[in-house]
A protein has these predicted regions:
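A detector for small-residue-rich transmembrane helices and their helix-helix packing motifs
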Residues: 1-184
Length: 184
């Protein structure tokens, strides 16, 4: 399933949403420019659970937790996150206002990062991605727009359908898939 758009029009220009998408794309372009030194860069600048636990929550760790939200592990990771932010973030920003949306986005990203750190405190793998912040935006979307529908590209074997799916169903499936991929 690939979301194409929702049926909720925005009343304001979603500048923060667009800036977040542009920032994620710019950071990914920077990642690509690093070539072979990318791994070392990520290990130096991303949050690593065991380091956060051993060093405590310092200003340096706060910076790493912020950077973590803008690093991505590949094209699919980046593009899927940005597609969901593009489709659902504009409405959430419209309802919350620009500044509150930015604060909400960052806070849910930090909460997701902390949840991962506390779930896997001995992990030495750097955390990358905006998925936690995106999940926060999707949760807010469901609360704010429970009756919304999502125009969706659905693949059924060799057939492709474009249909409207209730946002509750669409995002429920997304959530289950996230859980399954996280436990695989």
């Amino acid at each position: 399933m690939i979301p194409l758009r929702d049926d909720i029009p925005s009343n304001t220009f979603p500048i923060v949403n667009y800036i977040l998408i542009a920032a994620n794309l710019a950071v990914f372009a920077f990642e690509l420019s690093l070539g072979r030194s990318l791994d070392q860069y990520i290990f130096t600048h991303a949050a690593i659970p065991v380091q956060v636990v051993s060093e405590g929550f310092t200003a340096g760790q706060f910076v790493k937790m912020t950077a973590t939200m803008f690093f991505h592990g590949g094209w699919l990771h980046l593009l899927s996150n940005m597609l969901y932010l593009w489709i659902f973030g504009d409405n959430v920003e419209d309802r919350m206002g620009h500044f509150r949306f930015l604060v909400f986005y960052l806070l849910t990203g930090y909460l997701a990062t902390f949840a991962h750190i506390f779930s896997f405190p001995e992990s030495t793998i750097p955390l990358v991605g905006a998925s936690g912040a995106i999940a926060g935006v999707l949760g807010a979307y469901l609360v704010l727009f429970p009756q919304a529908r999502v125009l969706t590209l659905v693949f059924i074997f060799i057939f492709i359908q474009v249909i409207y799916i209730p946002a509750l169903v669409f995002l429920g499936i997304w959530f289950v898939l996230q859980l399954l991929s996280g436990t695989a």
